[in-house]
Swiss-Prot record:
Gene: gmhB
Disulfide partners: none
Annotated GO biological process: ADP-L-glycero-beta-D-manno-heptose biosynthetic process; lipopolysaccharide core region biosynthetic process
Family matches, as PANTHER family: D-GLYCERO-BETA-D-MANNO-HEPTOSE-1,7-BISPHOSPHATE 7-PHOSPHATASE
Pathway entry: Nucleotide-sugar biosynthesis; ADP-L-glycero-beta-D-manno-heptose biosynthesis; ADP-L-glycero-beta-D-manno-heptose from D-glycero-beta-D-manno-heptose 7-phosphate: step 2/4; Bacterial outer membrane biogenesis; LPS core biosynthesis
Protein name as it appears in the record: D-glycero-beta-D-manno-heptose-1,7-bisphosphate 7-phosphatase
Subcellular location(s) per record: Cytoplasm
Subunit structure: Monomer.
Source organism per UniProt: Helicobacter pylori (strain J99 / ATCC 700824) (Campylobacter pylori J99)
UniProt family annotation: Belongs to the GmhB family.
Sites where the protein binds substrate: 11-13, 19-22, 53-56, 104-105, 131
Enzyme class: hydrolase
C-alpha cells in the first residue's frame, strides 16, 4: 500500500470544541479558540484532517447515534462555511470503557483504519488531543508526532509534546 499522505488526527471534545461533557446538541457545541487557525494551517500544508473520537454517550444512552450524526453534520457545515473545507474523515467509537471493544482510544484501531483508507504515512503525521488516551492511541498506532493540549503538564516517560493552547500546536506542525 502506498502511504504518501500525511494527516492531522484530532480528537473532538476538548480540541475541536469546548468539552462540556457528552456534547450532543449544536446548542451546546462551541468551537475551541484557535481551532479554525489550526485546521487552516494544517490543510494549507497538505495534511488530511481526520477526526478520531470516543463517543461513549451513545451506548450509555445519553444521546443517540442520530444525535451524533446531526451534530457531526453541523460541525462539517460550520467548517465549510468558515474555512471553505471540512474534515476529510470521521472515525468514532460508541462504546463505553467497560465494553472492552477494539476501537476505543487508547487502542489504535480507529487511527489505523483512517490511515489505511486515506493512504497515510504515520511517520509524517500528528495526533492531537487533550487526554492521555488520545496520546496513547497515537503512540499505539505509531504516529510519530503527538501533541497534548493541557494546562496542567503531565510527568510522563512518553514522547509527546505538551502545549498550552492550539496556537502553540500550530508552531509544531510544519
Amino acid at each position: 500500500m502506498i502511504t504518501t499522505n500525511k494527516a492531522l488526527f484530532l480528537d473532538r471534545d476538548g480540541i475541536i470544541n469546548i468539552d462540556r461533557g457528552y456534547v450532543s446538541q449544536k446548542e451546546d457545541f462551541e468551537f475551541q479558540k484557535g481551532i479554525f487557525e489550526l485546521l487552516k494551517h494544517t490543510k494549507t500544508l497538505g495534511y488530511k484532517l481526520l477526526l478520531i473520537t470516543n463517543q461513549s454517550g451513545i451506548n450509555r444512552g445519553y444521546y443517540t447515534l442520530k444525535d451524533f450524526e446531526q451534530l457531526t453534520e453541523y460541525l462539517q457545515e460550520s467548517l465549510l462555511k468558515e474555512l471553505g473545507f471540512n474534515l476529510d474523515g470521521i472515525y468514532f467509537c460508541r462504546h463505553a470503557p467497560e465494553e472492552n471493544c477494539a476501537c476505543r482510544k487508547p487502542k489504535p484501531s480507529l487511527i489505523l483504519q483512517a490511515a489505511k483508507e486515506h493512504q497515510i504515512c504515520l511517520e509524517r503525521s500528528f495526533m492531537i488531543g487533550d487526554k492521555e488516551s488520545d496520546m496513547l492511541a497515537g503512540l499505539n498506532a505509531k504516529v510519530k508526532n503527538n501533541l497534548l493540549l493541557t494546562q496542567n503538564p503531565l510527568k510522563t516517560p512518553h514522547s509527546w509534546i505538551q502545549c498550552k493552547n492550539l496556537k502553540e500546536m500550530i508552531d509544531w506542525i510544519k
